[in-house]
């Protein structure tokens, strides 16, 4: 019996991957399945291709606990490129407008207050988010 065959039958648990930029969450999952021959594997949530960060992977019986892991608060760290707008709302899309205006600290802090608490949002068309199993 090879190591890979043994892993497929014996591993039940969690693996937390530091997802690299430009990889989709699904691409990470596919690579793990291919490398270790896992048959039952899933991830919690999803990270957009430009995001770098923790991607919890559930292997084997641990998949039964994904629903208990996903409904918790998350923390995001981000950077901002002031003065441009793109068609995709991120740095990847073509720039559609530019400005030399730079907001001051006070106006940034006031604007950030609008994003505290529960907020209903419509995801952009380019988002990887799914609602009810279909892309939002």
What positions do the PLM features span?
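Catalytic/RNA-binding core of pseudouridine synthases
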Residues: 1-136
């Amino acid at each position: 019996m090879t190591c890979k065959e043994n892993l497929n039958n014996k591993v039940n648990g969690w693996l937390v991957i530091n997802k690299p930029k430009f990889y989709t969450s699904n691409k990470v999952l596919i690579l793990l399945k291919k490398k270790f021959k896992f048959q039952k594997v899933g991830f919690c949530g999803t990270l957009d291709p430009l995001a770098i960060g923790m991607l919890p992977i559930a292997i084997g019986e641990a998949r039964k606990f994904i629903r208990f892991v996903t409904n918790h608060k998350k923390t995001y760290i981000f950077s901002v490129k002031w003065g441009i707008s793109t068609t995709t709302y991120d740095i990847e899309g073509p720039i559609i407008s530019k400005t030399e205006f730079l907001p001051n600290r006070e106006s940034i802090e006031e604007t950030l207050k609008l994003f505290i608490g529960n907020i209903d949002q419509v995801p952009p068309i380019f988002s990887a988010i799914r609602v009810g199993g279909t892309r939002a």
